[in-house]
């Protein structure tokens, strides 16, 4: 059966929007799931996540659907942006009906970009609302946009030897089955091309002319590091038109982390907040393990596209500079 590439927006019941402040080097990306919402799961592997409403996605939680996912910069400060998404959805009568109003269920994960641009400007409710307006036209783009505006990679020795990254996406169709991924790449580790194993972006030598292997730096000294650089976190979403419930989607999110592991080294560290959501947007019957394996593959490709589509900015070089 032939597999073909499709757009990340080629899923029914999905709208994706970006909003950013390019001068301040921060932004957010929203995924809206319509009036009916969508089942979702979450798997967090990093040691330092910044998140909102993540408890909703645990298998024992009562909620079976959510209405939106927001990926954002700003670290924990950026969690304010979800308020704008809630406002947008409430105005349109979207949410969990509690009689007196409808409460939109909005999950959010943030990355750390405070050291790239202006630390005093972070995604807020106004920016979250603007991302929703952008989603009406599916204004999503890969690169230095949305949650990827201030993203960077390879920060083992700090910002002076890291590179610019961004947000990326990739989706495929296999028969009637669709699987896609969107990811903002902001890792401590180096990014590798999952297809051939070559370094694409990451930690550089002091003169910023050559790549350094972050794992070699880690292995060179096993003593406890008190001031490890913590400004990291890769956050992503896997999408499918196959029908799954929350427990199954948590497993799919876990399998998608294989895509992180193929592309980022080291990954899932105590200085990262690596998280992946999985969302079901259809009724198609499909094998969970097949979708999980595809989820890992599209996530790896989305990571690659996130760094390949990024442009040099804020004094940071990009992968295009090393081609």
List where the protein language model places each region.
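A structural signal for small-residue-enriched, beta-sheet-centric alpha/beta enzyme cores
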Residues: 2-76, 80-83, 91-323
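Active-site catalytic microenvironments for nucleophilic, acid-base chemistry
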Residues: 88
